[in-house]
A protein has these predicted regions:
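Sequence-level preference for short, compositionally simple segments enriched
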Residues: 26-343
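N-terminal low-complexity, Pro/Thr-rich disordered segments
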Residues: 1-31
Length: 343
């Protein structure tokens, strides 16, 4: 996205020591261990060797690499072997403004530690992080540093962690008006600026979200949780439901979101409901403009949120009970084929 910022290592998970969800694979299992005790030493080597429907099973360890699952690897499952995402870490440190070896810059999407372009992908029991830090690169202007680039349909991310600073998770629809759905359950997501963003339909269900402190004084600006750029033709954008947001930042220093408006058809849709919000949220006005585009022109709403960061008033649009029945994980993800990963 437009100018933003970097990453680091945190602890935390959506559900401690949880067993991984069943994968959707029907083919082989390819094993990975960086000590050479498995068939492959790197995660990408196993992905390259995998066919559609295979499972890549990753042993405990830290893997310093970028990974890319192309569209042809439909139905691939990436699974941490222990079931605890803190044990299996895939990490890298590119930013949008990082120079590429062959010339040019990576750009926002290209900065991702992990890119999943295939449909029907399942990711479970891993940590994916981008450790690029603003403070270490004061000369870099484009500070977006993506951990996860999710750009396929019917993708599931379960019991996993996604950690960066700016633009942690990109929920992307390569064809803006087409159907791209991504489901996150029992995950942990951390960042500071626009760190859940994009134009896909994405549901964050029973996740833990950490707003990372950038050191702003009370009442200042530490950052923004979300920045959707949903196409105007789509009924649903990003939904955060039944989740917990926490932060060590000072009170009133974080916005819940702002509308990313890269083109005339991007309006931004975001609903946060039944979620615990921390004191770090700007309770009087949690939404803000972006690039001259008013948040009031987007579709931002809340419903039944709790915690010290919850509130009401003219600057906090609320769904009615009737409207809330259409803003559920099921309704967002059903699409034209009735997909229901919540079962």
């Amino acid at each position: 996205m437009a100018a933003k910022a970097g990453a680091g290592v945190l602890t935390g998970t959506g559900r401690n020591a949880a067993a991984p969800a069943p994968g959707s694979a029907t083919g082989r299992t390819l094993t990975v261990a960086h000590d050479g005790s498995a068939a492959h030493r790197s995660v990408q080597a196993a992905i390259d060797a995998a066919a559609a429907g295979d499972t890549v099973l990753v042993s405990r360890g830290t893997y310093h690499e970028t990974i890319d699952v192309p569209a042809a690897k439909r139905g691939l499952t990436l699974k941490g072997a222990t079931g605890n995402p803190e044990d299996v870490v895939i990490t890298y440190d590119n930013a949008a403004g990082t120079a590429k070896p062959g010339g040019g810059r990576y750009g926002t999407a290209g900065s991702a530690t992990a890119t999943f372009s295939a449909n029907d992908v399942t990711v479970t029991g891993v940590t994916i992080q981008n450790t690029w830090e603003r403070s270490a690169h004061p000369d870099v202007k484009d500070t977006q540093a993506v951990a996860l680039n999710a750009s396929g349909d019917r993708q599931k991310y379960v019991d996993s962690r996604f950690i960066a600073h700016q633009d942690t998770v990109l929920n992307w629809a390569p064809h803006a008006t087409a159907q791209y759905r991504q489901y996150f359950r029992h995950c942990f997501v951390a960042g500071d600026v626009d760190f859940v963003f994009g134009n896909a339909t994405a549901v964050y269900d029973h996740v833990n979200i950490t707003l990372r402190d950038r050191g702003a004084a009370a009442g200042g600006n530490n950052g923004y949780l979300a920045a959707p750029n949903t196409d105007s033709a789509k009924p649903y954008g990003i939904l955060i439901t039944d989740s917990t947001v926490d932060s060590a930042a000072r009170a009133g220093t974080f916005y819940l979101g702002r509308p990313w408006h890269p083109g005339p058809d991007a309006v931004g849709r975001l609903v946060i409901r039944n979620t615990v919000l921390p004191a770090a949220v700007k309770t009087g006005a949690p939404w803000t403009d972006m690039g001259g585009f008013s948040w009031k022109s987007a579709h931002f709403a809340e419903y039944a949120n709790t915690g010290p960061g919850a509130g009401g008033g003219a600057n906090r649009p609320q769904l009615t009970a009737a409207q809330a029945t259409t803003h559920t994980a099921r309704s967002y993800l059903a699409g034209t084929d009735g997909w229901n990963p919540t079962l």
